[in-house]
Amino acid sequence: MKEKIHPKYNTATNVSCACGNTFTVGSTKDSIKVELCAQCHPFYTGEKRMVDTAGRVEKFRQRYGNKT
């Protein structure tokens, strides 16, 4: 491996979720913000709910127009 070309790896990076949960992982970033984690994701909680962040269909229609 070449020296001095790799990013600095942090062994204790804080990850904060929109639900308020925080945990520590290793990463090249100082802090990470996520919308879903294992504490609030429907797959892990067993809840039946739709997870659609920022409406993908609406984003598509805004970008390309509603031609239908």
UniProtKB/Swiss-Prot annotation:
Zn(2+) binds at residues 17, 19, 37, 40. One of its GO terms (cellular component) is ribosome. It holds the Pfam family Ribosomal_L31. InterPro entries: Ribosomal_bL28/bL31-like_sf, Ribosomal_bL31, Ribosomal_bL31_A, Ribosomal_bL31_sf. Binds 1 zinc ion per subunit. Signal peptide: none annotated. It comes from the Bacteria. One of its GO terms (biological process) is translation. GO terms for molecular function: metal ion binding; rRNA binding; structural constituent of ribosome. PANTHER family: 50S RIBOSOMAL PROTEIN L31, CHLOROPLASTIC, LARGE RIBOSOMAL SUBUNIT PROTEIN BL31C. Belongs to the bacterial ribosomal protein bL31 family. Type A subfamily. Binds the 23S rRNA. Part of the 50S ribosomal subunit. This is Large ribosomal subunit protein bL31. It comes from Dehalococcoides mccartyi (strain ATCC BAA-2266 / KCTC 15142 / 195) (Dehalococcoides ethenogenes (strain 195)).
